[in-house]
Amino acid sequence: MSAFARMTGADARWNPEGLREDSEYRDLGLAAVTNGRIGAKHIRTLKPMAAPTGWHWHDMTAHYVFVLRGSLTFRFAGVAGDVTLRAGDGLSQPAGVPHNVIARSDDLEVIEINEPAAYGTWDLAEPPAPWT
């Protein structure tokens, strides 16, 4: 890292602009001190999940999710069955793996860490096997 980064609860600046309209985001400052190599954000939901996210993938080399509160359920290409994370659970997702968030609690809060900080999200026209 190129600098110390400390963020307190008083520093929290929640931003409704992010990947999902039903959530808000708080940048945890890693992108600034790593010159964009690593991103970290605190995400919390604002309203009930209306529908699954749909199959998509992220253009990143590393993706880690840690659940602070609530739960969420994924489907991943190449993984049989659903994967549910609850408070205290973490998941390291391989780069580029198609996935679909099919359920989440209304009180969900997570920390996401990704590499790089800025990345693209690509929707898939069709679900991958075996979900077709």
Residue ranges and their predicted role:
Residues H42-T45, W57-G78, I113-P116:
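Short, conserved beta-strand element in jelly-roll/cupin
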Residues G78-G96:
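Short acidic-glycine-tyrosine-enriched beta hairpin
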Residues E17, A51-D59, F76, V83-T84, ...:
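Short histidine-centered beta-strand/loop micro-motifs
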Residues M60, V79, V97-P98, D106-D107:
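A generic "binding-loop/recognition-motif" signal
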Residues H42-R44, D89, H99:
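Hydrophobic/aromatic beta-strand elements that line small-molecule binding cavities or substrate pockets
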Residues T34, G81, N100, Y119:
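Flexible, glycine-rich phosphate/dinucleotide-binding loops
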Residues M1-K47, T121-T132:
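A short, N-terminal "cap"/entry segment at the start of jelly-roll beta-barrel domains
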Residues I38-K41, S92, S105-W122:
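A short hydrophobic beta-strand segment most commonly corresponding to one strand
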